[in-house]
Amino acid sequence: MDKKYSLQHSIFLACSFVLLIWFIKLFEAAFGVSFSHMGVYPQTASGFFGILTAPLIHGSFNHTLANTLPVLLLGSMLFYGYPRSRWWVLSAIWILSGLGVWLFARSSYHIGASGLTHGLFFYLFIAGIIRRDPRSSALLMIAFFMYGTMFWTIFPQAPDISFEYHLFGALSGAGCAIRCSHWDPLPVEKKYSWEIETAENELDEEDPVIGDQWKTAVNEHPEFETAAGQYKKVF
C-alpha cells in the first residue's frame, strides 16, 4: 500500500481512469444507449447501487470533457504526493460522496466524476495546510491555482448540475484530509554538500577566548548539575 509511484506511473493511473470514462461514453454513442439509469437516485434501492457506478457515467461529451482534465491532474497529484493514503482516500471519496447524494440530494439521477474531482481538490488543499511540508504545499498551490473555483461550485448553480455531488465530494475530501493526511511520511529533506561542509566547519571552529578546550573540559562541580546538563541556581 505504501509503494511509491513515480510521476509517470501516477499520470498513467489517472489516464487509465480517464480512458475508462471516455470508453463508456463512446460505447453509449456508438450503440445508441444511455447508462444514466446507473447513476445515484436518492433514497431508492436501485439508485443505491449507483454509488459504485455514477462517477463513470456522464450525460454528454461536454460533460465528459469537463471532467477529463481535473481527473487527470488532481488524480496524478494524489497518487504521486500521498503514497500510503491514496487508495484509501480515493475509495472513501468515491463511496462517501455517493452516499451523501443518495441520502440528501434531489430526486433525480446524479452522474459524473465531478464529485470525485471536488473530493480530490479539497483533500489536496486541506492536507497541504495540515502537513505544510514542501511537497504537500506545492500540490496545494498547484491545485488551488488550477481549480480554486471549486470553492464556489459546491453551491447551487444551474438546475441540471448536481451541486450535491460537488458538496458531498468536498466534505468527503476534507474529512479524509483530517483523518488520513498524517499517514504519509514527510519527505526526506535533501542536504547539499556545501550545507554539510558549512555545518561541519561551524562545529570545528574554535572559541576565540578558550579555543577548543570546552570540548574536553571536565566538570569540577557535578553536585550543581541537573539531569539536563544545566546548572542549578544557588542562593
Residue ranges and their predicted role:
Residues 1-3, 154-235:
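C-terminal transmembrane module of polytopic alpha-helical membrane proteins
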Residues 7-88, 98, 103-110:
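N-terminal TM1-TM2 helical hairpin plus the immediately adjacent luminal interfacial "cap"
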Residues 17-20, 92-93, 97, 101, ...:
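Alpha-helical transmembrane segments in multi-pass membrane proteins
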Residues 21, 52, 63, 115, ...:
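Divalent metal-coordination and catalytic microenvironments
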Residues 57-60, 102-111, 129-133, 153-161:
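Membrane-interface helix caps and helix-loop-helix hairpins in membrane proteins
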Residues 65-82, 119-130, 171-183:
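Membrane-interfacial alpha-helical segments at the cytosolic side of multi-pass membrane proteins
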Residues 90-96, 137-147:
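Central hydrophobic cores of alpha-helical transmembrane segments
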Residues 107-123, 163-165:
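Membrane-interface micro-motifs in multi-pass membrane enzymes
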